[in-house]
């Protein structure tokens, strides 16, 4: 085969006339280009390291400071108050340096020291400024003079064009709340969920903890917070994610869907070519650290960017006791799964990224390949879908050497994983509800063996060219994948585009090596483990009751007219819907972020409050008036927003209690209070998918190009998982998951209650859905 010959730089044979050496010039050329590419990336990393290392100054400012110091010395002005003279005296005790040389060297050294001191002062000043969070608690739309001055100072110290990681060393550390404050907030959060007798018992446990064991655990936690960059994130990653022994599929991984109503081409290979190229463009921008750091409050307050580091070239490696995350700096290939076969596809040729048409060519060759799967190959990925321990043992036994290790390395060290799915998914006008549900379920779990659930992202291209992503959760949270996904969809349609016949723009290239099949030698014993994993994973997947639907009766535009937060509005609608569905309240989880702090991830907002319960009960009481309901609604919204702000600013409940629990385990002490708190089930788990890059295209002019967001599986066996995305002014998309095996839950029933709850609340304001126009 041609590609096999191209892969060999030289060959030799021994003949009677001597050694016959044959060089492959094409292979040598590709080796040289690969080396140049590698050195170019190293240089870019080195340059970016310098730029980020001197932030908020810039490297050129060093020259300005040094020239200024030396110029003042020539003008007989000593800017150092005698320090330059001291440096000069200590430079050369042998007397071999001329006085002019000593003066210049002394001036450069003093100027450099002054420059570093100014940088450290600016950085510390910025960190102090970013530690202020009073702006979050100000009344919406009203900004005090002191806040405006504070914002101006932050902007001055933030530089003109910060890179992705520029703010990392200037971000404050996540503060450790006082134990008594956390315990008090916890008791307030469970008050509406407990009977008086149970609440009094929990209050006694909590108060005993706050006085006795709590302060001891807190001392160790504070010690960690002084030493570690973030006192939560490493333990959260290890104990919540990596030590989990259950399946990643459904339980941990989540999915992202694309545009609902638009499919720019119906050619599967073409859609794959464009979108893979768009992903690679994003990766290149990320590698160069040219992504703009996300900033709040009018692009002023930066969020932590640490989670972007492991977006690509990352895989979760199974272990018997705990998993690990493997991340490599660079990967020049992807692995593509189609019809039970695994293919390795190189992403570079002639020292450049493959163009969209060239990637389409590669994908089409895979689709046209008639070869059959090797024994055990077709359903191999089921190992990543089921329990971790069998996969870890199987990996160690059958994939630690030989061709199996080489092929597994290719998968785990790929930039990302691609599935060319044989099914057709997406919105169908003749059956909108079932088609969207099927689309979501396919992205969440597929057929349990056609997604590599260990990879940071599995990119799925369906036969009818609809696309989606399945993402592993341990390395980062959903907003990072969402940021990538927004870029990919916009670049695919509005930047790259397609030809009139639906192909990628550009020309094919016959010189590109073809995709190569990964080779496996999977014995019968291993195939039995694969079959067992597939069986257990299929039971889990078939139990998922997933309902995904668009809500277009009104959106953010109309909610704003109610003078309330869209998120608070939806959260109260969820509380009302849950009560309609279950006839009771439950502990509710809403994911918030703590990325205002260095290496921050998430915090929990306990959305079921006394205020929200009072509102829901008023809505269910036919005797209550609209005025009473509206008043209670506004009180509940204000409470929710206050809790959300507390969570964002490091004053949440659950991460603090979680870390105290980890400390108690290290100290081998038992806490009945912490044990009970951490065993409470979240029967309603919710999350909003943020829209982060509204500048990519105009939603109002392109209303059909809206994303459906994404979703996740239910957290509790008898509960619901609800995700939602607010797009533009008039569109919200919901994803509801539960389990068929629970007699108490029904995702479609909950969806109907949620639609009605949204309409019931908007009616309180005397607004109709036509008010949005």
UniProtKB/Swiss-Prot annotation:
Residues in coiled coil: none
Gene Ontology CC terms: mitochondrial outer membrane; mitochondrion
Tissue: Liver and kidney.
Enzyme Commission number(s): 2.3.1.21, 2.3.1.-
Chain positions with 3'-nitrotyrosine modification: 282, 589
Domain notes per entry: A conformation change in the N-terminal region spanning the first 42 residues plays an important role in the regulation of enzyme activity by malonyl-CoA.
Name of the protein described by the UniProt record: Carnitine O-palmitoyltransferase 1, liver isoform
